[in-house]
Amino acid sequence: MKPDAHQVKQFLLNLQDTICQQLTAVDGAEFVEDSWQREAGGGGRSRVLRNGGVFEQAGVNFSHVHGEAMPASATAHRPELAGRSFEAMGVSLVVHPHNPYVPTSHANVRFFIAEKPGAEPVWWFGGGFDLTPFYGFEEDAIHWHRTARDLCQPFGEDVYPRYKKWCDDYFYLKHRNEQRGIGGLFFDDLNTPDFDHCFAFMQAVGKGYTDAYLPIVERRKAMAYGERERNFQLYRRGRYVEFNLVWDRGTLFGLQTGGRTESILMSMPPLVRWEYDYQPKDGSPEAALSEFIKVRDWV
């Protein structure tokens, strides 16, 4: 079946609505919407919830941009895209909770299509979701990965292990020699066996994110915490910033295509701290995190 960009766009707009409604139901606060246009073509809807009952900041962004040529970040690993016009659309979100016992989460689903006259379109889907805890709870990690595994199951037994490994490899801070969190799913360049199959998988990932995340939020949001936990949360958020600005392909793509900087950097935590040569106390819950986020099979 020929790729149907309009159908994908409708799904993404509905997904943004649904996720915002689900997060509002947990938090109580409303999202503020900011619609924007891109001079070179396209636009989007950025929605942000700030200082809610549960979430310090949650950003859920829809964007649909198009242009005459792909940026360097996209053609570097796909040279056949050079000289093609492109459309890129997606929903991307990051949730930064107040409570350090509630993990930060990120999800993204996207679709690219690149065309030139007289040639077949080049298209693919990408996306995934990943979890960044500050304090590790095994039952949360197992639930997160079990949800990821179960949504992958109808698409093949090898899908979850493949995309889990890709996630572990992708969300890795080389300069720190550590994982960003406990991973989840990551996929890109998905265009086989056909459009319908790939689109169905992307939809399953988009819908599966809140199934994976919200039960963890409900379980942890009322846990008591103090200044020590908050300081550690802010320190660990620094890793999030480092990854997004140094390693993340999506951030680079957005900035190189003249995307809307406010929306691209919406993933940044509102507060963060760095501390020179920070070492948590041996045997402390803070020290346990470095072991907890090491790659392992959770299910």
From Swiss-Prot:
Substrate binds at S92, N108, V109, R110, G258, G259, R260. Pathway: Porphyrin-containing compound metabolism; protoporphyrin-IX biosynthesis; protoporphyrinogen-IX from coproporphyrinogen-III (O2 route): step 1/1. A divalent metal cation binds at H96, H106, H145, H175. It is an enzyme of class 1 (oxidoreductase). It is found in: Cytoplasm. Its cofactor is a divalent metal cation. The active site is at H106. GO terms for molecular function: coproporphyrinogen oxidase activity; metal ion binding; protein homodimerization activity. GO terms for cellular component: cytoplasm. Its EC number is 1.3.3.3. Signal peptide: none annotated. The record marks H175 as: Important for dimerization. Keywords: Cytoplasm, Heme biosynthesis, Metal-binding, Oxidoreductase, Porphyrin biosynthesis. The keyword NAD does not apply. GO terms for biological process: protoporphyrinogen IX biosynthetic process. It catalyses: coproporphyrinogen III + O2 + 2 H(+) = protoporphyrinogen IX + 2 CO2 + 2 H2O. Residues 240-275 are annotated as: Important for dimerization. SUPFAM superfamilies: Coproporphyrinogen III oxidase. Involved in the heme biosynthesis. Catalyzes the aerobic oxidative decarboxylation of propionate groups of rings A and B of coproporphyrinogen-III to yield the vinyl groups in protoporphyrinogen-IX. Belongs to the aerobic coproporphyrinogen-III oxidase family. Homodimer. This is Oxygen-dependent coproporphyrinogen-III oxidase. The gene is hemF.
